[in-house]
Amino acid sequence: MKGNMKVYWIKIAVATWFCCTTIVLGSTARIFSLPTNDEEETSKTLGLDTVSFSTKGATYITYVNFLNELRVKLKPEGNSHGIPLLRKKCDDPGKCFVLVALSNDNGQLAEIAIDVTSVYVVGYQVRNRSYFFKDAPDAAYEGLFKNTIKTRLHFGGSYPSLEGEKAYRETTDLGIEPLRIGIKKLDENAIDNYKPTEIASSLLVVIQMVSEAARFTFIENQIRNNFQQRIRPANNTISLENKWGKLSFQIRTSGANGMFSEAVELERANGKKYYVTAVDQVKPKIALLKFVDKDPKTSLAAELIIQNYESLVGFD
């Protein structure tokens, strides 16, 4: 009888320990949002290429190497006048995006999804949550960051849309410290009542320091040469960003002599306007071109598409 009682009390003790442990650990897991194995394997199961960059111990050299690796992962198809040309389209969801894993000195991580045909940011994951721009394609929303709690933001990824959340290029600092803070803010807003303005301002830093810097050697060098400082995009930087589509079109459709069919208006740092009429005038500033059909029969249609797109996002 005593032996049976001893076994009985042991069972009670074990059961009590199990229940308490489950409650405590379960609560702790929710507080810290520890990632599951499924979440950690998201990029692997999709077969997406991933490029990583950490602000911890970062130098301008590691930053430049990161941008070069990203350009390679985007897998441009051919070139125009020696400038790599991005893919025309992507039919395989598993190859339409590249993940950029950004981490900071605190170990906070944000995985940014980038479209390989345009270098546009479509969404990102922090902890067990993912967020997508309002205008992100359905293929991105449905196919990326599975096993996460998904949210469509009420604003898009265009500059005018970001400005609607008080995120302006002219007043946004760029550099290693702003990027570190941006990653931190994205991580801190992995909650139900997130702050749209903090997300928008943080994503604007990412867009400038990743997407735009990958497109333009000029912007890469601006950040590289002021890496440990805070800089803000001047008129020359903003005008290049706004005219990427038109520059790509003119370069792609120009003949062997590299002359543009139509001059492209740009601005200097002081806001003074000037015009470029040939590839050689802007080639040193551009690292990637957006695909534009070179066929004369479709080039006009392509130009109209670019003009329509740029009017939608607020570009000239």
From Swiss-Prot:
Known catalytic reactions: Endohydrolysis of the N-glycosidic bond at one specific adenosine on the 28S rRNA
Propeptide: 27-46, 298-316
One biological process term in Gene Ontology: negative regulation of translation
Record keywords: Allergen, Disulfide bond, Glycoprotein, Hydrolase, Plant defense, Protein synthesis inhibitor, Signal, Toxin
One Pfam family of this chain: RIP
Keyword Metal-binding: no
Glycosylated residues in this chain: N235
UniProt key word Cell membrane: no
Domain of life: Eukaryota
Record-level Gene Ontology MF annotations: carbohydrate binding; protein homodimerization activity; rRNA N-glycosylase activity; toxin activity
Disulphide-bonded residues: C90-C96
Entry protein name: Ribosome-inactivating protein gelonin
Species of provenance: Suregada multiflora (False lime)
